[in-house]
Amino acid sequence: MAKIRRASFEFCQYSSRYDRFKDGIIENAFNPALGNAAVSDIGVYCIHSLVRLFGTPKNIHSMSSSLENNFECSGIVLMEYPDMIAEAIYSKVTVSYRPSVIQGENGSILIDYISHPTQIELRLREGSRDPINGGIKEILPYSPVNNNMIYEIKNFLSLVENNGIEHEYLQYSLDTIRIIDHVLASHTSVH
């Protein structure tokens, strides 16, 4: 792939509770008093994945949309790194079928669902024989499991059993929370 220049991770999932919100029934999923904004609920998957892969960004910019009750329902977070830019796109009130993408100078990696990948593709620029598909396509080896929480549970149990308070995952989580806090602090209501 050569030098990575851009990453765009997206998780836009229409909430099953949104129709009830539109009918005037405000459930916990759309109650701003509970602090469960979309960035904290589903944007975290994009942001955490970017932090795990690329580290803490040097600059963060964000924009959010709100519902009538000031619930932050969707947004975009731009994250600046020394040689690349990343974006986290998230929504609880729309749906998207676009894959998440890591773009390098010689190709791209496409990830079907950032929250629970089931297919990861490498598409290279060089040697293109099929311009419609953007070049050579290779399916990368990946074996999803039925319950994607199994990895988290195994790691969590290991941390508890080994008193792993200072584990590397802690720093990823702290960096992710700092970014989310920045987004929430800069959130202005856009209806």
Regions found by a protein language model. Give the residues of each.
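Short glycine/proline- and acidic residue-enriched helix-loop micro-motifs
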Residues: 29-34, 133-141
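Active-site loop of classical SDR/Rossmann-like NAD(P)-dependent oxidoreductases
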Residues: 140-154
